[in-house]
Protein backbone atom coordinates (compact mmCIF):
# COMPACT_ATOMS: atom_id res chain seq x y z
CA UNK A 1 0.00 0.00 0.00
CA UNK A 2 1.42 3.41 -1.05
CA UNK A 3 4.35 1.35 -2.36
CA UNK A 4 7.49 3.49 -2.77
CA UNK A 5 9.30 0.29 -3.75
CA UNK A 6 7.29 0.29 -6.98
CA UNK A 7 4.14 -1.12 -8.51
CA UNK A 8 3.15 -2.22 -11.99
CA UNK A 9 0.04 -0.88 -13.74
CA UNK A 10 -1.23 -2.68 -16.83
CA UNK A 11 -3.96 -1.02 -18.93
CA UNK A 12 -5.39 -2.92 -21.90
CA UNK A 13 -7.11 -1.32 -24.88
CA UNK A 14 -10.88 -0.89 -24.81
CA UNK A 15 -13.58 -1.02 -27.51
CA UNK A 16 -13.29 1.53 -30.31
CA UNK A 17 -16.03 3.75 -31.73
CA UNK A 18 -15.34 2.47 -35.27
CA UNK A 19 -14.68 -1.03 -36.53
CA UNK A 20 -11.06 -2.16 -36.57
CA UNK A 21 -9.19 -5.46 -36.59
CA UNK A 22 -5.61 -6.62 -36.74
CA UNK A 23 -3.65 -9.84 -36.90
CA UNK A 24 0.05 -10.45 -36.29
CA UNK A 25 2.14 -13.57 -36.71
CA UNK A 26 5.67 -14.19 -35.46
CA UNK A 27 7.85 -17.18 -36.23
CA UNK A 28 10.93 -17.72 -34.09
CA UNK A 29 13.77 -19.54 -35.82
CA UNK A 30 15.53 -20.23 -32.51
CA UNK A 31 12.43 -21.32 -30.59
CA UNK A 32 11.14 -23.17 -33.66
CA UNK A 33 7.54 -22.11 -33.45
CA UNK A 34 4.89 -19.45 -34.03
CA UNK A 35 3.15 -16.81 -31.99
CA UNK A 36 -0.13 -15.49 -33.38
CA UNK A 37 -2.16 -12.62 -31.94
CA UNK A 38 -5.02 -10.46 -33.10
CA UNK A 39 -8.01 -8.40 -32.12
CA UNK A 40 -11.35 -7.21 -33.43
CA UNK A 41 -13.06 -4.13 -32.04
CA UNK A 42 -16.00 -1.88 -32.74
CA UNK A 43 -19.59 -0.93 -31.93
CA UNK A 44 -22.33 -3.54 -31.60
CA UNK A 45 -25.04 -0.94 -31.15
CA UNK A 46 -25.25 2.75 -30.37
CA UNK A 47 -24.72 2.01 -26.66
CA UNK A 48 -22.59 -1.14 -26.66
CA UNK A 49 -19.04 -1.71 -27.93
CA UNK A 50 -16.82 -4.77 -27.78
CA UNK A 51 -13.20 -5.78 -28.23
CA UNK A 52 -11.89 -9.35 -28.43
CA UNK A 53 -8.15 -10.02 -28.32
CA UNK A 54 -6.49 -13.44 -28.58
CA UNK A 55 -2.96 -14.78 -28.50
CA UNK A 56 -1.58 -18.27 -29.16
CA UNK A 57 1.98 -19.51 -28.65
CA UNK A 58 3.43 -22.86 -29.72
CA UNK A 59 7.20 -22.71 -29.35
CA UNK A 60 10.09 -24.88 -28.22
CA UNK A 61 12.77 -23.83 -25.78
CA UNK A 62 16.38 -22.71 -25.89
CA UNK A 63 17.93 -25.50 -23.78
CA UNK A 64 18.45 -29.00 -25.21
CA UNK A 65 17.53 -31.82 -22.82
CA UNK A 66 19.98 -34.57 -23.71
CA UNK A 67 17.86 -37.15 -21.86
CA UNK A 68 14.90 -36.90 -24.24
CA UNK A 69 16.20 -34.87 -27.18
CA UNK A 70 13.69 -32.08 -26.55
CA UNK A 71 14.36 -28.32 -26.63
CA UNK A 72 13.05 -26.96 -23.34
CA UNK A 73 11.10 -25.26 -21.93
CA UNK A 74 8.39 -25.84 -24.53
CA UNK A 75 5.63 -23.23 -24.32
CA UNK A 76 2.04 -23.88 -25.36
CA UNK A 77 -0.33 -21.11 -24.33
CA UNK A 78 -3.64 -19.51 -25.25
CA UNK A 79 -5.03 -16.21 -24.00
CA UNK A 80 -8.33 -14.47 -24.74
CA UNK A 81 -9.64 -11.13 -23.46
CA UNK A 82 -13.16 -9.83 -24.07
CA UNK A 83 -13.97 -6.23 -23.21
CA UNK A 84 -17.48 -4.77 -23.35
CA UNK A 85 -18.35 -1.10 -22.91
CA UNK A 86 -21.95 -0.11 -22.26
CA UNK A 87 -22.80 3.61 -22.32
CA UNK A 88 -26.59 4.09 -22.34
CA UNK A 89 -26.37 7.79 -21.38
CA UNK A 90 -23.87 10.61 -21.33
CA UNK A 91 -23.60 10.26 -17.55
CA UNK A 92 -23.07 6.51 -17.14
CA UNK A 93 -20.81 3.86 -18.65
CA UNK A 94 -19.84 0.35 -17.60
CA UNK A 95 -16.81 -1.63 -18.76
CA UNK A 96 -16.69 -5.40 -18.32
CA UNK A 97 -13.45 -7.28 -18.93
CA UNK A 98 -13.08 -11.07 -18.93
CA UNK A 99 -9.66 -12.65 -19.45
CA UNK A 100 -8.83 -16.34 -19.72
CA UNK A 101 -5.36 -17.87 -19.95
CA UNK A 102 -4.18 -21.44 -20.25
CA UNK A 103 -0.47 -22.19 -20.32
CA UNK A 104 1.53 -25.40 -20.35
CA UNK A 105 5.31 -25.44 -20.16
CA UNK A 106 7.07 -28.76 -20.69
CA UNK A 107 10.55 -29.13 -19.27
CA UNK A 108 12.69 -26.89 -17.13
CA UNK A 109 15.13 -24.05 -17.58
CA UNK A 110 17.70 -24.85 -14.90
CA UNK A 111 21.22 -25.99 -15.79
CA UNK A 112 24.16 -27.15 -13.69
CA UNK A 113 27.47 -25.37 -13.19
CA UNK A 114 30.53 -25.87 -10.95
CA UNK A 115 30.41 -24.65 -7.37
CA UNK A 116 34.05 -23.58 -7.42
CA UNK A 117 34.15 -21.32 -10.50
CA UNK A 118 32.25 -18.29 -11.77
CA UNK A 119 28.97 -19.10 -13.46
CA UNK A 120 29.26 -21.31 -16.54
CA UNK A 121 25.68 -21.77 -17.76
CA UNK A 122 25.25 -24.10 -20.72
CA UNK A 123 22.42 -24.48 -23.20
CA UNK A 124 22.17 -28.23 -22.56
CA UNK A 125 20.83 -30.17 -19.60
CA UNK A 126 20.04 -33.77 -18.64
CA UNK A 127 16.72 -34.34 -16.88
CA UNK A 128 14.84 -37.64 -16.59
CA UNK A 129 11.26 -38.37 -15.56
CA UNK A 130 10.52 -38.35 -11.83
CA UNK A 131 7.76 -40.32 -10.02
CA UNK A 132 5.51 -37.34 -9.18
CA UNK A 133 4.88 -36.03 -12.68
CA UNK A 134 6.43 -34.58 -15.83
CA UNK A 135 8.67 -31.58 -15.31
CA UNK A 136 7.03 -28.30 -16.22
CA UNK A 137 4.24 -25.89 -15.36
CA UNK A 138 0.50 -25.82 -15.96
CA UNK A 139 -1.51 -22.68 -15.24
CA UNK A 140 -5.16 -21.84 -15.81
CA UNK A 141 -6.44 -18.41 -14.80
CA UNK A 142 -9.52 -16.20 -14.99
CA UNK A 143 -9.65 -12.45 -14.42
CA UNK A 144 -12.98 -10.63 -14.40
CA UNK A 145 -13.41 -6.94 -13.67
CA UNK A 146 -16.28 -4.52 -13.99
CA UNK A 147 -15.84 -0.74 -13.84
CA UNK A 148 -18.78 1.62 -13.70
CA UNK A 149 -18.56 5.41 -13.92
CA UNK A 150 -21.47 7.67 -13.03
CA UNK A 151 -21.32 11.42 -13.57
CA UNK A 152 -23.05 13.28 -10.74
CA UNK A 153 -22.84 16.83 -11.97
CA UNK A 154 -19.16 17.69 -11.85
CA UNK A 155 -18.38 14.67 -9.66
CA UNK A 156 -17.58 11.12 -10.87
CA UNK A 157 -18.53 8.05 -8.85
CA UNK A 158 -16.60 4.91 -9.83
CA UNK A 159 -17.19 1.30 -8.81
CA UNK A 160 -14.65 -1.46 -9.58
CA UNK A 161 -15.55 -5.10 -8.94
CA UNK A 162 -12.95 -7.80 -9.47
CA UNK A 163 -12.65 -11.57 -9.42
CA UNK A 164 -9.38 -13.46 -9.81
CA UNK A 165 -8.81 -17.20 -9.99
CA UNK A 166 -5.89 -19.42 -10.86
CA UNK A 167 -4.81 -22.99 -10.38
CA UNK A 168 -1.36 -24.20 -11.25
CA UNK A 169 1.12 -26.97 -10.75
CA UNK A 170 4.88 -26.67 -10.97
CA UNK A 171 7.03 -29.81 -11.10
CA UNK A 172 10.77 -29.26 -10.72
CA UNK A 173 13.69 -31.45 -11.64
CA UNK A 174 17.27 -30.27 -11.34
CA UNK A 175 19.81 -30.73 -14.12
CA UNK A 176 21.50 -34.10 -13.60
CA UNK A 177 24.53 -33.22 -15.72
CA UNK A 178 27.72 -33.27 -13.64
CA UNK A 179 29.87 -30.21 -14.47
CA UNK A 180 33.02 -32.37 -14.59
CA UNK A 181 31.34 -34.75 -17.04
CA UNK A 182 28.71 -37.47 -17.06
CA UNK A 183 25.37 -37.51 -15.28
CA UNK A 184 24.05 -38.37 -11.85
CA UNK A 185 20.86 -39.74 -10.35
CA UNK A 186 17.62 -37.72 -10.29
CA UNK A 187 17.85 -37.65 -6.51
CA UNK A 188 15.57 -34.73 -5.60
CA UNK A 189 12.43 -33.31 -7.20
CA UNK A 190 9.36 -31.42 -6.04
CA UNK A 191 5.90 -30.25 -7.01
CA UNK A 192 3.79 -27.25 -5.97
CA UNK A 193 0.07 -27.43 -6.85
CA UNK A 194 -1.62 -24.08 -6.06
CA UNK A 195 -5.16 -22.74 -6.01
CA UNK A 196 -6.19 -19.09 -5.50
CA UNK A 197 -9.36 -17.05 -5.75
CA UNK A 198 -10.18 -13.50 -4.72
CA UNK A 199 -13.12 -11.11 -4.80
CA UNK A 200 -12.57 -7.36 -4.54
CA UNK A 201 -14.67 -4.22 -4.53
CA UNK A 202 -13.59 -0.59 -4.72
CA UNK A 203 -15.70 2.57 -4.69
CA UNK A 204 -14.24 6.03 -5.20
CA UNK A 205 -15.47 9.57 -5.73
CA UNK A 206 -13.59 12.03 -7.94
CA UNK A 207 -14.14 15.73 -7.37
CA UNK A 208 -14.42 18.31 -10.16
CA UNK A 209 -11.07 19.13 -11.77
CA UNK A 210 -9.57 22.49 -12.62
CA UNK A 211 -10.34 23.94 -9.17
CA UNK A 212 -8.14 25.14 -6.34
CA UNK A 213 -8.69 21.89 -4.43
CA UNK A 214 -9.26 18.53 -6.14
CA UNK A 215 -9.62 15.21 -4.41
CA UNK A 216 -10.39 11.49 -4.61
CA UNK A 217 -11.88 9.52 -1.72
CA UNK A 218 -12.75 5.86 -1.65
CA UNK A 219 -12.89 2.48 0.04
CA UNK A 220 -11.64 -0.98 -0.90
CA UNK A 221 -12.38 -4.54 0.27
CA UNK A 222 -11.14 -7.97 -0.77
CA UNK A 223 -11.46 -11.53 0.45
CA UNK A 224 -9.22 -14.36 -0.74
CA UNK A 225 -8.54 -18.07 -0.35
CA UNK A 226 -5.15 -19.62 -1.10
CA UNK A 227 -4.12 -23.29 -1.00
CA UNK A 228 -0.65 -24.71 -1.58
CA UNK A 229 0.47 -28.33 -1.61
CA UNK A 230 4.14 -29.27 -1.57
CA UNK A 231 5.49 -32.67 -2.57
CA UNK A 232 9.19 -33.30 -2.06
CA UNK A 233 10.61 -36.50 -3.47
CA UNK A 234 13.99 -38.16 -2.91
CA UNK A 235 15.74 -41.04 -4.63
CA UNK A 236 19.22 -41.05 -3.08
CA UNK A 237 21.63 -43.94 -3.50
CA UNK A 238 25.09 -43.26 -2.11
CA UNK A 239 26.34 -46.61 -0.73
CA UNK A 240 27.84 -46.31 2.70
CA UNK A 241 26.49 -42.78 3.13
CA UNK A 242 22.76 -42.57 2.43
CA UNK A 243 20.30 -44.81 0.62
CA UNK A 244 16.83 -43.30 0.77
CA UNK A 245 13.59 -43.18 -1.17
CA UNK A 246 10.71 -41.13 0.15
CA UNK A 247 8.01 -38.58 -0.51
CA UNK A 248 7.35 -35.67 1.85
CA UNK A 249 4.22 -33.55 1.84
CA UNK A 250 3.12 -30.23 3.31
CA UNK A 251 -0.27 -28.52 3.06
CA UNK A 252 -1.01 -24.82 3.54
CA UNK A 253 -4.34 -23.00 3.65
CA UNK A 254 -4.96 -19.29 4.10
CA UNK A 255 -8.05 -17.10 4.23
CA UNK A 256 -7.64 -13.35 4.20
CA UNK A 257 -9.69 -10.18 4.28
CA UNK A 258 -8.53 -6.65 3.70
CA UNK A 259 -10.37 -3.35 4.06
CA UNK A 260 -9.08 0.14 3.43
CA UNK A 261 -10.27 3.71 3.10
CA UNK A 262 -8.20 6.26 1.25
CA UNK A 263 -8.09 9.80 0.03
CA UNK A 264 -5.91 11.97 -2.14
CA UNK A 265 -6.09 15.71 -2.50
CA UNK A 266 -4.38 18.30 -4.69
CA UNK A 267 -4.16 21.87 -3.45
CA UNK A 268 -3.29 24.30 -6.25
CA UNK A 269 -1.70 27.25 -4.45
CA UNK A 270 -1.04 28.95 -7.79
CA UNK A 271 -0.98 27.87 -11.41
CA UNK A 272 2.65 26.85 -10.88
CA UNK A 273 2.71 25.46 -7.33
CA UNK A 274 0.67 22.55 -5.97
CA UNK A 275 0.71 20.09 -3.09
CA UNK A 276 -0.57 16.53 -3.41
CA UNK A 277 -1.30 14.57 -0.27
CA UNK A 278 -2.70 11.11 0.28
CA UNK A 279 -3.67 8.96 3.24
CA UNK A 280 -4.68 5.29 3.33
CA UNK A 281 -5.87 3.24 6.30
CA UNK A 282 -5.79 -0.54 5.87
CA UNK A 283 -7.09 -3.34 8.07
CA UNK A 284 -5.88 -6.87 7.21
CA UNK A 285 -6.97 -10.17 8.77
CA UNK A 286 -5.49 -13.57 7.90
CA UNK A 287 -5.88 -17.12 9.15
CA UNK A 288 -3.36 -19.79 8.19
CA UNK A 289 -3.07 -23.54 8.70
CA UNK A 290 -0.06 -25.72 7.94
CA UNK A 291 0.83 -29.36 8.41
CA UNK A 292 3.45 -31.76 7.11
CA UNK A 293 3.65 -35.52 6.85
CA UNK A 294 5.63 -38.39 5.38
CA UNK A 295 3.73 -39.81 2.40
CA UNK A 296 6.14 -42.69 1.77
CA UNK A 297 9.57 -43.83 2.86
CA UNK A 298 11.20 -45.45 5.87
CA UNK A 299 11.62 -42.16 7.72
CA UNK A 300 11.34 -38.42 7.23
CA UNK A 301 14.54 -37.05 5.74
CA UNK A 302 13.47 -33.66 7.08
CA UNK A 303 11.31 -32.76 10.09
CA UNK A 304 7.89 -32.86 8.43
CA UNK A 305 5.53 -34.16 11.11
CA UNK A 306 4.68 -30.67 12.31
CA UNK A 307 1.59 -28.52 12.50
CA UNK A 308 1.10 -24.79 12.75
CA UNK A 309 -1.92 -22.54 13.06
CA UNK A 310 -2.04 -18.81 13.25
CA UNK A 311 -4.06 -15.68 12.74
CA UNK A 312 -3.15 -12.04 12.45
CA UNK A 313 -4.95 -8.74 12.49
CA UNK A 314 -3.06 -5.64 11.44
CA UNK A 315 -3.81 -2.05 10.63
CA UNK A 316 -1.62 0.50 8.92
CA UNK A 317 -1.78 4.18 8.09
CA UNK A 318 0.23 5.13 5.01
CA UNK A 319 0.60 8.85 4.16
CA UNK A 320 2.37 10.64 1.32
CA UNK A 321 2.97 14.26 0.43
CA UNK A 322 4.30 15.75 -2.82
CA UNK A 323 5.17 19.32 -3.77
CA UNK A 324 5.31 20.25 -7.46
CA UNK A 325 6.52 23.52 -8.95
CA UNK A 326 6.42 24.50 -12.62
CA UNK A 327 9.39 26.74 -13.42
CA UNK A 328 7.98 26.99 -16.93
CA UNK A 329 5.22 25.06 -18.71
CA UNK A 330 7.99 22.70 -19.88
CA UNK A 331 10.01 22.29 -16.64
CA UNK A 332 8.59 20.86 -13.42
CA UNK A 333 10.38 20.05 -10.16
CA UNK A 334 8.97 17.88 -7.41
CA UNK A 335 9.76 16.48 -3.99
CA UNK A 336 7.86 13.69 -2.26
CA UNK A 337 7.74 11.76 0.97
CA UNK A 338 5.77 8.54 1.30
CA UNK A 339 5.27 5.69 3.69
CA UNK A 340 4.29 2.23 2.47
CA UNK A 341 3.45 -1.07 4.10
CA UNK A 342 3.06 -4.74 3.30
CA UNK A 343 1.04 -7.00 5.56
CA UNK A 344 2.61 -9.87 7.44
CA UNK A 345 1.87 -13.45 6.60
CA UNK A 346 2.55 -17.12 7.16
CA UNK A 347 5.30 -19.49 6.04
CA UNK A 348 3.71 -21.71 3.41
CA UNK A 349 6.22 -24.34 2.32
CA UNK A 350 9.05 -24.79 4.83
CA UNK A 351 9.44 -28.28 6.27
CA UNK A 352 9.27 -28.49 10.04
CA UNK A 353 7.31 -25.25 10.46
CA UNK A 354 5.80 -24.83 13.94
CA UNK A 355 3.69 -22.16 15.60
CA UNK A 356 6.89 -20.41 16.69
CA UNK A 357 8.20 -20.01 13.12
CA UNK A 358 4.89 -19.85 11.24
CA UNK A 359 4.35 -16.10 11.12
CA UNK A 360 6.46 -13.29 9.71
CA UNK A 361 6.00 -9.61 10.48
CA UNK A 362 4.61 -6.80 8.30
CA UNK A 363 7.03 -4.71 6.27
CA UNK A 364 7.20 -0.92 6.34
CA UNK A 365 9.03 1.51 4.10
CA UNK A 366 9.70 5.22 3.89
CA UNK A 367 10.73 6.99 0.71
CA UNK A 368 12.08 10.45 0.00
CA UNK A 369 12.40 11.46 -3.64
CA UNK A 370 13.09 14.64 -5.59
CA UNK A 371 13.44 15.27 -9.27
CA UNK A 372 12.96 17.40 -12.36
CA UNK A 373 10.93 16.62 -15.49
CA UNK A 374 11.50 18.79 -18.55
CA UNK A 375 10.74 19.18 -22.24
CA UNK A 376 13.21 21.46 -24.00
CA UNK A 377 14.23 22.75 -27.43
CA UNK A 378 10.67 22.95 -28.75
CA UNK A 379 9.98 19.36 -27.79
CA UNK A 380 13.12 17.93 -29.37
CA UNK A 381 14.70 17.08 -26.01
CA UNK A 382 13.08 15.47 -22.97
CA UNK A 383 15.16 15.22 -19.78
CA UNK A 384 14.11 13.69 -16.45
CA UNK A 385 16.20 13.04 -13.36
CA UNK A 386 15.40 11.98 -9.79
CA UNK A 387 17.17 11.01 -6.59
CA UNK A 388 15.66 8.82 -3.91
CA UNK A 389 16.32 7.32 -0.50
CA UNK A 390 14.15 4.38 0.59
CA UNK A 391 14.41 2.63 3.94
CA UNK A 392 12.75 -0.66 4.87
CA UNK A 393 11.85 -1.90 8.32
CA UNK A 394 11.26 -5.64 8.77
CA UNK A 395 11.98 -6.27 5.09
CA UNK A 396 10.28 -9.54 4.11
CA UNK A 397 12.78 -12.03 2.69
CA UNK A 398 12.69 -15.61 1.47
CA UNK A 399 16.15 -17.16 1.54
CA UNK A 400 17.28 -20.61 0.42
CA UNK A 401 19.28 -22.34 3.16
CA UNK A 402 21.38 -25.00 1.43
CA UNK A 403 22.44 -26.53 4.75
CA UNK A 404 18.78 -27.35 5.47
CA UNK A 405 17.71 -27.51 1.79
CA UNK A 406 14.69 -25.30 2.48
CA UNK A 407 13.51 -21.78 1.73
CA UNK A 408 13.15 -19.78 4.94
CA UNK A 409 10.74 -16.84 5.00
CA UNK A 410 11.21 -14.14 7.59
CA UNK A 411 12.20 -10.52 8.14
CA UNK A 412 15.43 -8.62 7.88
CA UNK A 413 15.48 -5.95 10.57
CA UNK A 414 16.20 -3.10 8.17
CA UNK A 415 17.48 -2.32 4.69
CA UNK A 416 17.90 0.73 2.50
CA UNK A 417 18.19 1.70 -1.14
CA UNK A 418 19.60 5.00 -2.34
CA UNK A 419 20.09 6.05 -5.90
CA UNK A 420 19.62 8.30 -8.87
CA UNK A 421 17.61 7.67 -12.03
CA UNK A 422 17.55 9.57 -15.28
CA UNK A 423 16.03 9.40 -18.73
CA UNK A 424 16.50 11.36 -21.92
CA UNK A 425 14.84 11.44 -25.32
CA UNK A 426 16.28 13.36 -28.27
CA UNK A 427 14.42 13.99 -31.53
CA UNK A 428 16.96 15.74 -33.79
CA UNK A 429 14.72 15.32 -36.85
CA UNK A 430 11.30 13.93 -37.69
CA UNK A 431 12.58 10.49 -38.69
CA UNK A 432 15.28 9.97 -36.06
CA UNK A 433 15.13 9.56 -32.28
CA UNK A 434 17.35 8.44 -29.40
CA UNK A 435 16.26 7.44 -25.90
CA UNK A 436 18.33 6.63 -22.83
CA UNK A 437 17.36 5.50 -19.33
CA UNK A 438 19.95 4.83 -16.64
CA UNK A 439 19.97 4.22 -12.90
CA UNK A 440 22.47 3.90 -10.09
CA UNK A 441 21.46 2.39 -6.76
CA UNK A 442 23.08 1.28 -3.54
CA UNK A 443 20.83 -1.31 -1.88
CA UNK A 444 21.98 -3.11 1.26
CA UNK A 445 20.93 -4.63 4.55
CA UNK A 446 21.38 -2.18 7.40
CA UNK A 447 20.65 -4.78 10.08
CA UNK A 448 19.88 -8.48 9.61
CA UNK A 449 20.47 -10.55 12.75
CA UNK A 450 19.90 -14.29 12.42
CA UNK A 451 20.52 -14.29 8.67
CA UNK A 452 21.59 -17.48 6.93
CA UNK A 453 25.35 -17.76 6.48
CA UNK A 454 26.83 -16.19 3.37
CA UNK A 455 29.32 -18.08 1.23
CA UNK A 456 31.88 -15.32 1.76
CA UNK A 457 31.76 -15.64 5.56
CA UNK A 458 34.45 -17.85 7.16
CA UNK A 459 33.18 -20.68 9.33
CA UNK A 460 34.63 -18.91 12.36
CA UNK A 461 32.18 -16.07 11.72
CA UNK A 462 29.13 -18.14 10.80
CA UNK A 463 28.90 -21.91 11.10
CA UNK A 464 25.62 -23.27 9.64
CA UNK A 465 26.15 -26.53 11.55
CA UNK A 466 26.16 -24.62 14.85
CA UNK A 467 22.69 -23.19 15.67
CA UNK A 468 24.15 -20.66 18.11
CA UNK A 469 26.62 -19.39 15.52
CA UNK A 470 23.93 -19.07 12.86
CA UNK A 471 21.56 -17.31 15.27
CA UNK A 472 24.25 -14.75 16.11
CA UNK A 473 25.00 -13.99 12.47
CA UNK A 474 24.35 -10.48 11.17
CA UNK A 475 24.95 -9.54 7.53
CA UNK A 476 24.52 -5.78 7.93
CA UNK A 477 26.26 -3.97 5.08
CA UNK A 478 25.80 -6.81 2.59
CA UNK A 479 24.07 -5.92 -0.69
CA UNK A 480 20.52 -7.01 -1.36
CA UNK A 481 20.45 -9.96 -3.76
CA UNK A 482 19.31 -9.42 -7.35
CA UNK A 483 20.23 -5.72 -7.28
CA UNK A 484 22.82 -4.12 -9.56
CA UNK A 485 24.64 -0.90 -8.85
CA UNK A 486 24.08 0.30 -12.42
CA UNK A 487 21.55 -0.44 -15.15
CA UNK A 488 20.74 1.22 -18.46
CA UNK A 489 18.69 1.03 -21.64
CA UNK A 490 19.61 2.81 -24.88
CA UNK A 491 17.55 2.88 -28.07
CA UNK A 492 17.91 4.49 -31.50
CA UNK A 493 15.14 4.56 -34.08
CA UNK A 494 15.32 5.67 -37.71
CA UNK A 495 12.55 5.92 -40.29
CA UNK A 496 13.62 5.87 -43.96
CA UNK A 497 11.05 6.89 -46.56
CA UNK A 498 10.91 4.85 -49.77
CA UNK A 499 9.10 7.26 -52.02
CA UNK A 500 5.76 8.58 -50.77
CA UNK A 501 4.10 5.29 -49.86
CA UNK A 502 6.51 2.95 -48.04
CA UNK A 503 9.00 3.19 -45.19
CA UNK A 504 11.75 1.17 -43.54
CA UNK A 505 11.66 1.52 -39.76
CA UNK A 506 14.84 0.44 -37.94
CA UNK A 507 15.19 0.20 -34.16
CA UNK A 508 18.36 -0.79 -32.30
CA UNK A 509 18.39 -1.21 -28.54
CA UNK A 510 21.14 -1.93 -26.03
CA UNK A 511 20.36 -2.71 -22.39
CA UNK A 512 22.38 -4.05 -19.52
CA UNK A 513 23.29 -3.99 -15.89
CA UNK A 514 26.34 -4.39 -13.69
CA UNK A 515 27.14 -7.51 -11.69
CA UNK A 516 24.79 -8.73 -8.98
CA UNK A 517 24.29 -11.66 -6.64
CA UNK A 518 21.54 -14.00 -7.78
CA UNK A 519 22.06 -16.63 -5.08
CA UNK A 520 20.75 -16.14 -1.57
CA UNK A 521 24.09 -17.11 0.00
CA UNK A 522 25.81 -14.48 -2.20
CA UNK A 523 28.53 -16.81 -3.43
CA UNK A 524 31.18 -14.73 -5.23
CA UNK A 525 31.59 -17.69 -7.60
CA UNK A 526 28.47 -19.59 -8.67
CA UNK A 527 26.11 -17.03 -7.14
CA UNK A 528 27.20 -13.88 -8.95
CA UNK A 529 25.94 -12.87 -12.39
CA UNK A 530 28.57 -10.77 -14.11
CA UNK A 531 27.66 -7.50 -15.78
CA UNK A 532 26.32 -7.72 -19.29
CA UNK A 533 24.81 -5.88 -22.23
CA UNK A 534 22.21 -7.30 -24.61
CA UNK A 535 21.66 -6.02 -28.13
CA UNK A 536 18.22 -6.04 -29.75
CA UNK A 537 17.29 -4.92 -33.26
CA UNK A 538 14.20 -4.65 -35.44
CA UNK A 539 13.89 -3.77 -39.14
CA UNK A 540 10.34 -3.25 -40.42
CA UNK A 541 9.03 -2.57 -43.93
CA UNK A 542 5.53 -1.43 -44.84
CA UNK A 543 3.33 1.38 -46.10
CA UNK A 544 3.14 4.77 -44.43
CA UNK A 545 -0.40 4.15 -43.17
CA UNK A 546 0.78 0.93 -41.43
CA UNK A 547 -1.99 -1.20 -42.97
CA UNK A 548 0.48 -4.05 -43.08
CA UNK A 549 4.09 -4.70 -42.20
CA UNK A 550 6.83 -7.31 -42.30
CA UNK A 551 9.79 -7.26 -39.93
CA UNK A 552 12.88 -9.12 -38.84
CA UNK A 553 13.37 -9.04 -35.07
CA UNK A 554 16.48 -10.01 -33.15
CA UNK A 555 16.65 -10.26 -29.35
CA UNK A 556 19.87 -10.70 -27.39
CA UNK A 557 21.91 -10.69 -30.59
CA UNK A 558 25.10 -10.77 -28.51
CA UNK A 559 23.85 -14.17 -27.22
CA UNK A 560 24.60 -13.34 -23.60
CA UNK A 561 23.98 -16.32 -21.31
CA UNK A 562 22.60 -14.81 -18.11
CA UNK A 563 20.96 -16.37 -15.09
CA UNK A 564 17.97 -15.29 -13.04
CA UNK A 565 18.86 -17.20 -9.87
CA UNK A 566 21.24 -19.87 -8.58
CA UNK A 567 21.63 -22.15 -5.57
CA UNK A 568 23.82 -24.92 -4.19
CA UNK A 569 22.55 -28.51 -4.50
CA UNK A 570 24.70 -30.10 -1.77
CA UNK A 571 25.94 -33.53 -0.71
CA UNK A 572 24.36 -35.91 0.37
CA UNK A 573 21.11 -34.79 -1.29
CA UNK A 574 23.06 -35.55 -4.45
CA UNK A 575 26.17 -37.61 -5.01
CA UNK A 576 27.49 -34.83 -7.27
CA UNK A 577 27.31 -31.43 -5.52
CA UNK A 578 26.76 -28.69 -8.07
CA UNK A 579 25.27 -25.28 -8.63
CA UNK A 580 21.82 -25.11 -10.16
CA UNK A 581 21.04 -21.93 -12.07
CA UNK A 582 18.09 -20.73 -14.08
CA UNK A 583 19.13 -19.70 -17.58
CA UNK A 584 17.40 -16.72 -19.15
CA UNK A 585 16.47 -16.66 -22.82
CA UNK A 586 19.39 -16.67 -25.23
CA UNK A 587 19.57 -15.23 -28.76
CA UNK A 588 16.25 -15.28 -30.61
CA UNK A 589 15.75 -14.23 -34.23
CA UNK A 590 12.26 -14.15 -35.68
CA UNK A 591 10.24 -12.89 -38.60
CA UNK A 592 7.01 -10.95 -38.10
CA UNK A 593 4.12 -10.00 -40.34
CA UNK A 594 0.98 -8.08 -39.49
CA UNK A 595 -2.10 -6.55 -41.07
CA UNK A 596 -4.67 -4.00 -39.93
CA UNK A 597 -8.23 -3.77 -41.21
Language-model regions, residue ranges each:
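Outer-membrane beta-barrel translocator/receptor signature
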Residues: 1-65, 70-80, 91-92, 142, ...
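Outer-membrane beta-barrel proteins
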Residues: 26-35, 57-89, 124-142, 184-200, ...
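Solvent-exposed loop segments that connect transmembrane elements
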Residues: 63-71, 108-132, 173-191, 231-251, ...
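Outer-membrane beta-barrel domain signature, strongest for Gram-negative TonB-dependent receptors
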Residues: 69, 74-216, 222-224, 382-383
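Structural signature of Gram-negative outer-membrane beta-barrels, strongest in the C-terminal barrel
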Residues: 85-89, 205-208, 220-222, 252-390
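Membrane-embedded beta-barrel scaffold of Gram-negative outer-membrane proteins
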Residues: 145-174, 326-342, 359-427, 433-439, ...
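Gram-negative outer-membrane beta-barrel transporters
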Residues: 214-216, 275, 389-391, 410-520, ...
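C-terminal beta-signal and adjacent terminal beta-strands/loops
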Residues: 510-521, 541-597
